[in-house]
Amino acid sequence: PQHPWYQRGRKRLKEYRALETAGGWSPISTGPTMKPGMSDPRVPALRYRLTVSKDLEGTLEAPTPPYDTLYDPALEAAVKRFQQRHGLTPDGAIGPGTLQALNVPVSARIDQIRVNLERSRWVLHELHGNFVLVDVAGFNVSYFRDDEPVWTSKVIVGRPYRETPIFKSTISYVVFNPTWTIP
């Protein structure tokens, strides 16, 4: 497909394969929750990880002391971008959930990209112009006009035992603020 999303995915796959060839990234060690303004010996590893994933702009050169272990505002913004992209609460804190997402190996990320590219092949060739897209995993819905997002909102989806069905359909009408009674 020639859809821009698919092409971005292919580019990202190429980048991640190059990262894998170069050795990927090492896991960041566990420890207490890192918060902005703190100094922590894990910060250089965090900087490297967020730079290779392009959440943090800059080079892979090590900062000079005392900034090498300081969790500064630029790093906080990068962490929030990473958290947002991975469906985590973008609070800037490196707790267990964020650390787990950061430590997913590059090979697993490549597998995720490949699966999503395959899904895209089935869906994106039919998406153009105006459409609504529900991101079940991200708990949000977006309205696109001329292939650009113009509105996004949080959405409630199913549960593991009552999964939201995946489908595509033409929308004939929308009901805002429907009546709802407790079952």
List each language-model region with its residue ranges.
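Auxiliary tRNA-acceptor-end handling modules of aminoacyl-tRNA synthetases
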Residues: 1-168, 172-183
